């Protein structure tokens, strides 16, 4: 990427589960939090916490805070629940990413950091599995 002026990078960690979406921006080391907003902070109803609309509002808030602080570009780390649970990001992940891109922040790298076990503990559901 050729840029005429230097970019100030942060790391946007998007955790998209099926119950909520977190958009958390830190500095490059990850030690200092710049902004953290969840879908549940943006909507009234519990059922809407993980919705794409709530994730979009959360990402817009975070982007505004980043611009105040002086961050102009972000690397994105997208994460699902992982472990013994689902490894696909929830419905808010994609829209949070899109909202960050549309807000004027430059996007550096996009990485999936969902925890995948090499050999994990036993999954919830018992011997005969979940019966529908």
From Swiss-Prot:
Annotated TM spans: none
SUPFAM superfamilies reported in the protein's UniProt record: Translational machinery components
Compositionally biased spans, kind Basic residues: 123-132
Cell wall biogenesis/degradation in keyword set: no
Annotated keywords: Cytoplasm, Ribonucleoprotein, Ribosomal protein
GO annotation terms (biological process): ribosomal small subunit assembly; translation
Any one Gene Ontology molecular-function term assigned to this protein's record: structural constituent of ribosome
Superkingdom, taxonomy of origin: Eukaryota
Quaternary assembly: Component of the small ribosomal subunit. Mature ribosomes consist of a small (40S) and a large (60S) subunit. The 40S subunit contains about 32 different proteins and 1 molecule of RNA (18S). The 60S subunit contains 45 different proteins and 3 molecules of RNA (25S, 5.8S and 5S).
Protein name: Small ribosomal subunit protein uS11
């Amino acid at each position: 990427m050729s840029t005429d002026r230097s970019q100030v990078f942060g790391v946007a960690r998007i955790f998209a589960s099926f119950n909520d979406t977190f958009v958390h921006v830190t500095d490059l080391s990850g030690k200092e939090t710049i902004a953290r907003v969840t879908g549940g902070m943006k909507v009234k109803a519990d059922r809407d916490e993980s919705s794409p609309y709530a994730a979009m509002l959360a990402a817009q808030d975070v982007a505004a805070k980043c611009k105040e602080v002086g961050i102009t570009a972000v690397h994105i780390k997208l994460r699902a629940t992982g472990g013994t649970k689902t490894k696909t990001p929830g419905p808010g992940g994609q829209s949070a990413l899109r909202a960050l891109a549309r807000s004027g922040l430059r996007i550096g790298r996009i990485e999936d950091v969902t925890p995948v076990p090499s050999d994990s503990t036993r999954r919830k559901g018992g011997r005969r599995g979940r019966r529908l």
